[in-house]
Structure formats: structure tokens, C-alpha cells
Regions:
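The beta1-alpha1 cofactor-binding region of Rossmann-like NAD(H)/NADP(H)-dependent oxidoreductases
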Residues: 61-71, 103
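Conserved glycine-rich Rossmann-like NAD(P)H-binding loop of the short-chain dehydrogenase/reductase
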Residues: 28-45
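Substrate-binding pocket helix/loop in short-chain dehydrogenase/reductase
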Residues: 97-110
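C-terminal helical subdomain
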Residues: 179, 192-228, 232
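Conserved glycine-rich cofactor-binding loop
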Residues: 7, 14-15
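Residue(s) in the substrate-gating loop at a strand-loop-helix junction
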Residues: 141
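Active-site helix of classical SDR
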Residues: 121, 155-156
Length: 244
């Protein structure tokens, strides 16, 4: 799909990968709707986009609040008349050992990382199918390819599997579905790590490329393809490495 003139909805757009993606799509000529809980941060991103000559709007959205998503979808479609590109980027990572994470935290992670994106996609997909035009991109994770963190990996495996299955089922519909699986990227989600990481612009560029040239899945940075391949052909080696 040509980005210029298209309408994109990006969730989790107040910072990190979502904010970088919104800026990149706007730079390429899309009309972008930024959705997240922190409206103040969203407005800062919109100000930066408009200052650079782009077009953007804000919707307050808590993706974990499933009951609110019909409102989010209808408001998003009303702003520019339709949604051509949906980037399911919102995600959280609450760290905790198995058996120790509170039930509310489990529900929050599952709803934000998995059930929310599925629900929002279900709400926006009919319009795309009717127009036979649309792009859906789900931001999963390398943790959705390599089982490591018990709940985070569980939600990202689920999102990745959902998107890949949806891609097959929508074949020849005019709607493409792709997965982006980032490794460690320098965002608020990885602030606990004290090592050099690529910036979110790397993933934003990958997402923009998928809009224009759809593919099944992109892993970025590229070197994470190596442990992913090992996980598939020699999982015992990955078991050994993760236990060290």
C-alpha cells in the first residue's frame, strides 16, 4: 500500500516504537491517529509531527479495557473517514516469577498484549474487507519466537500466532497482515537493561516498509534470527544458554 494519503492508527503511540512509527508514517505522508492512555504525551508527539509538516490526531485509548474498544474504533474511523493501516503496537511487560504475579497483573498483560489487539482488529477489519484495502501489522517480539519469560512470551507467542493465522485466512482479500518481532530496543519497556540497544526508529522503518511491501514477518535487529533458528532446529542449545 502507498503510505502517502493513507490513514494509520497506531496504538501505544505515546513513546518508544509506537511514537517512532507514528512519526515515520506521518513523514511519509500518512494521516496518523495516535492512541494510548497518556494523552499529554500523545499531544507532544502530535505537536512534533505537525511541526514537521505532517498530519496527526489523538485518541485516548486503554487497549486493556476491552469494553472501551468499540468507542476507540468508531472514534478513529470518524476522524478521517476510515482506517487503512492498523499498527497493533501497545504492549506491557510486568516481570514476575511463575506463581507470584497477581491475577490482576496477569489479566492486564494478556488484555494489553493479546486480547486487546485481537478485539481492535476485529472491530476495524470489516471496513478494510469492504474496501478490499488494508494493512494490519502486529508488533510481537523475539520473545514470541523464543520462549523465555513465561507470561510475556505467552502473550507474544499468542499475538504472533494470531497474526500469522489471520494472514493466511485473509489471503486474496486485499488486506495484508504482517508481524514485526523486535529484539531488545531502547524504549521505556527495556529501561531495566543497562546495555546498548538500537533505537525505535529501526522498528518504525521496518513497519513502514511492511506497509509498502507486505511480508510474513520481520525480525529486527537481524541478528536475532540466529537464536530463533536455533530455537527451531536445536532447542536444547537454547535451553542450555537460557539456564546459564
Amino acid at each position: 500500500m502507498k503510505i502517502a494519503g493513507a490513514v494509520a492508527l497506531v496504538t501505544g503511540a505515546s513513546s518508544g516504537i509506537g511514537a517512532a512509527t507514528a512519526r515515520e508514517l506521518a513523514r511519509r505522508g500518512a494521516r496518523v491517529i495516535l492512541a494510548a492512555r497518556r494523552v499529554d504525551l500523545l499531544r507532544e508527539q502530535v505537536a512534533a509531527i505537525t511541526a514537521a509538516g505532517g498530519q496527526a490526531s489523538v485518541i485516548e485509548a486503554d487497549i486493556s479495557d476491552l469494553a472501551s474498544l468499540p468507542r476507540v474504533a468508531s472514534e478513529a474511523e470518524a476522524i478521517y473517514g476510515q482506517i487503512d493501516i492498523l499498527v497493533n503496537n501497545a504492549g506491557i511487560h510486568i516481570r514476575g516469577k511463575p506463581g507470584q504475579l497477581a491475577p490482576d497483573d496477569i489479566a492486564l498483560m494478556v488484555n494489553t498484549n493479546l486480547t486487546g489487539p485481537i478485539t481492535l482488529t476485529r472491530l476495524l477489519l470489516p471496513g478494510m474487507l469492504q474496501r478490499r484495502r488494508g494493512v494490519i501489522i502486529c508488533v510481537a517480539s523475539v520473545a514470541g519466537n523464543i520462549a523465555n519469560d513465561w507470561l510475556y512470551s505467552g502473550t507474544k507467542f499468542g499475538l504472533r500466532g494470531y497474526a500469522l493465522a489471520l494472514r493466511r485466512q485473509l489471503h486474496s482479500s486485499g488486506v495484508s497482515v504482517s508481524v514485526v518481532s523486535p529484539g531488545y530496543i531502547d524504549t521505556p519497556l527495556t529501561s531495566y537493561r543497562h546495555s546498548r540497544m538500537p533505537g525505535p526508529a529501526l522498528i518504525a522503518n521496518a513497519i513502514a516498509a511492511l506497509v509498502e511491501r507486505p511480508r510474513r514477518e520481520v525480525v529486527a535487529p537481524w541478528w536475532y534470527r540466529i537464536p530463533i533458528a536455533l530455537e527451531r532446529i536445536a532447542p536444547w542449545l537454547v535451553d542450555f544458554g537460557l539456564r546459564r
